[in-house]
Amino acid sequence: MTVELIDMEVYMVDEDLSIKNAGPCHGHSCGCTIELDVTSPKKIEILVITKISSFHMIYDLSPLRAKLNDDPLDMELIKSLHTSTDLTVYRTSMLHHRNMPEKEYCFTQIYSATLNIDTKSTVSFRSTIHDGFLSTYPTIYINPEEKYYKVQNKGRLRMRVVTPILNSDKLQFMDKGEMYAGVGDDPSIVDSSDSDDYTSSEEDTEEEDTEEEED
């Protein structure tokens, strides 16, 4: 069974925090909005990864668009390769999901950006210019100074926040950071610790399932 999807992952490298599954299954769009709360100058390194499972969908996906406080943000495409993506998060009781495989091989693109901010800022990533998709995308509030985040809006996705970043996802220049304490409406927190073996919530998006993390 081949699953057509476009997926997005966002990695805040120095903060050791990642946002997974910011793209709808069987969709042709992905996106994410991050609200950053700082009170002093802060440099933030971000990686944005897009995954496309079907070759012909490459032509449907627009180049990644990014904005910082409504101003265009330069994104550098640093690598293109083939990887796999976890599909278990998308499984539901619906008939066409029951035989969904656990993984799907994808054409993957890795983008890089550096943010220099000194006050509250909003950064957004989009694979489309159509406003009709905006309600689909999640919004996450992050305070890097207090090591705190809150999922403001999950949109219509099964996104999840993972901190610290999974070992399998870390690139060689990532440094291990401190863990965040997450609160909010079903933040779907995943404490990955030092292992790549973890479980995440597979409940419907309407169902609240808040899990507290321990340092």
Swiss-Prot record:
Domain of life: Viruses
Acidic residues bias: start-end ranges: 193-215
Segments of this protein annotated with the region Disordered: 179-215
GO biological process, one term: viral process
Coiled-coil spans in chain: none
Function: Plays a role for multiplication of the virus in different cell types.
Family according to the record: Belongs to the poxviridae C7 protein family.
Protein name: Probable host range protein 2-2
